[in-house]
C-alpha cells in the first residue's frame, strides 16, 4: 500500500458536509416543523448506508460464485463476508428500538407530509432481496407488479435488469449440484440413508399409534403429519416426485443441490465439509435475520399506525406481516432438519469418497 501523497482531513474524507446536510424535514417546508422527523430521517438514512455495505459484500460473494470453480481460500472469504452481513443485519434489527422511542402521536405530526413516499421504494433493499434470490416469481402478489408500478422508470429498469442476472441462490444451487451423488461400486450412501430413514419413520409411526398420552383425534392428526413427512422423504429418492412437490412450492432447491446440502449437514464434522457447512449456516442466518427484520418492522408499523394504510398505498401492517411469512429465500436449509438422521444411523465415509468429494467441492 502506498503512503498518502496529500494529507487527508477527517471531515473531507467522510464528506460530512454532504451527509450532515442531508436531513431536509418535510414538515418544516410547510411551517409545521416536527421534532421527531429528524430521528425518522436519520434512522432511514443509516439503514440505506448499511444496505450499501451489505450490497458491497453480497456482490463480491456473487462474483466469486459466478465462475467455474470456487477454491477453499475463496470460500473462506465468502463465509467471512456473509458473517459480516449477519452482524450488520443484527445491528439494523436493534436499530428498530430507536424508532420505537417515537410515539404514534409524534409520528402522526409529520406522517401526512411523506405521502406517497414509502419504505418499499427503497431500491437498495429490493436489490438486496433480488441478489439474495427473492425474484419476482417468488414474491407475494402485491410485490410482483404493484410495487414496480410505483417506481420511477430509471429504478424500475435497474431492478428489472437485476432480475435477469443470476442471484446468489441460483449460483449456490449450481455449486451444490456439482457434487456427485455418492454412489460407487462399493458404497451407496443414499441406500444406507433410505434404509435408516424408513426405520426411523416406522418407529415414529409405532410411537404415535401406541401412545397412551394422545387421544384418537390427536393420533389421527399426528399420523397425517407423519405421512406428509414420509412423502417428503420419498421425494428425496424420486426425482419425478420431487419436481412435482417443487412445482407446488414445497421445495425450491434443485434435487441434486438439496441432496448435496443434506449430505454436507449430515457430515458437517468432516474437515472437508467445514467451509460448505459454514456457508449453508450463514445463508440460513441471513434469511433468519431478514425475517426478524420484517417481523419487527411489521410490529412497529402496527404500533404506529394500527390498521391504517401505509404512505405508499399498501395495507401497512398486513402487507409487512405477509412478507414476513412468504418472502423467505433459503427456507429449504431450515426445513432440512426434517431429513437429518442421528449419527449412529450413518455409515463412515470411505477414504475414496472423501478424496472424490474434495475434488468436486473446489
Curated annotation (Swiss-Prot):
EC number per UniProt: 1.13.11.11
Gene that this polypeptide is encoded by: kynA
Protein name, UniProt field: Tryptophan 2,3-dioxygenase
Function in brief: Heme-dependent dioxygenase that catalyzes the oxidative cleavage of the L-tryptophan (L-Trp) pyrrole ring and converts L-tryptophan to N-formyl-L-kynurenine. Catalyzes the oxidative cleavage of the indole moiety.
GO molecular function annotation: heme binding; metal ion binding; tryptophan 2,3-dioxygenase activity
Binding, substrate: 40-44, 111, 311
Subunit annotation: Homotetramer.
Pfam family, one: Trp_dioxygenase
Homology family: Belongs to the tryptophan 2,3-dioxygenase family.
Species in which this protein is naturally found: Alteromonas mediterranea (strain DSM 17117 / CIP 110805 / LMG 28347 / Deep ecotype)
Amino acid at each position: 500500500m502506498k503512503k498518502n501523497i496529500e494529507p487527508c482531513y477527517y471531515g473531507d474524507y467522510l464528506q460530512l458536509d454532504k451527509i450532515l446536510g442531508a436531513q431536509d424535514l418535510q414538515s418544516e417546508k410547510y411551517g409545521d416543523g416536527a421534532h421527531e422527523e429528524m430521528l425518522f430521517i436519520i434512522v432511514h438514512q443509516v439503514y440505506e448506508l448499511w444496505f450499501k455495505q451489505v450490497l458491497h459484500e453480497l456482490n463480491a460473494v456473487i462474483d466469486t460464485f459466478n465462475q467455474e470453480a470456487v477454491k477453499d481460500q475463496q470460500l473462506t472469504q465468502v463465509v467471512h463476508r456473509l458473517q459480516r452481513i449477519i452482524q450488520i443485519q443484527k445491528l439494523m434489527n436493534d436499530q428498530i428500538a430507536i424508532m420505537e422511542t417515537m410515539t404514534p402521536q409524534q409520528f402522526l405530526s409529520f406522517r401526512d407530509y411523506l405521502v406517497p413516499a414509502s419504505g418499499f421504494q427503497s431500491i437498495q433493499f429490493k436489490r438486496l432481496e433480488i441478489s439474495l434470490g427473492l425474484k419476482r416469481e417468488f414474491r407475494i402478489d402485491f410485490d410482483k407488479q404493484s410495487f414496480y408500478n410505483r417506481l420511477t422508470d430509471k429504478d424500475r429498469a435497474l431492478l428489472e435488469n437485476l432480475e435477469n442476472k443470476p442471484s446468489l441462490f441460483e449460483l449456490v444451487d449450481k455449486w451444490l449440484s456439482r457434487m456427485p451423488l455418492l454412489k460407487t461400486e462399493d458404497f451407496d450412501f443414499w441406500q444406507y440413508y433410505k434404509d435408516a430413514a424408513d426405520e426411523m419413520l416406522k418407529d415414529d409411526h409405532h410411537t404415535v399409534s401406541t401412545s397412551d398420552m394422545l387421544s384418537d383425534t390427536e393420533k389421527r392428526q399426528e399420523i397425517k403429519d407423519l405421512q406428509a413427512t414420509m412423502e417428503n422423504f420419498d421425494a428425496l429418492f424420486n426425482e419425478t416426485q420431487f419436481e412435482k412437490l417443487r412445482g407446488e412450492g414445497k421445495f425450491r432447491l434443485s434435487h441434486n443441490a438439496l441432496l448435496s446440502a443434506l449430505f454436507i449437514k449430515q457430515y458437517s464434522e468432516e474437515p472437508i465439509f467445514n467451509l460448505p457447512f459454514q456457508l449453508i449456516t450463514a445463508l440460513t442466518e441471513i434469511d433468519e435475520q431478514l425475517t426478524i427484520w420484517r417481523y419487527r418492522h411489521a410490529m412497529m408499523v402496527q404500533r404506529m399506525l394500527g390498521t391504517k394504510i401505509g404512505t405508499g398505498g399498501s395495507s401497512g401492517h398486513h402487507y409487512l406481516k405477509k412478507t414476513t411469512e412468504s418472502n423467505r429465500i433459503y427456507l429449504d436449509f431450515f426445513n432440512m432438519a426434517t431429513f437429518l438422521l442421528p449419527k449412529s444411523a450413518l455409515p463412515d465415509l470411505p477414504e475414496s469418497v472423501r478424496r472424490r468429494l474434495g475434488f468436486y467441492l473446489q
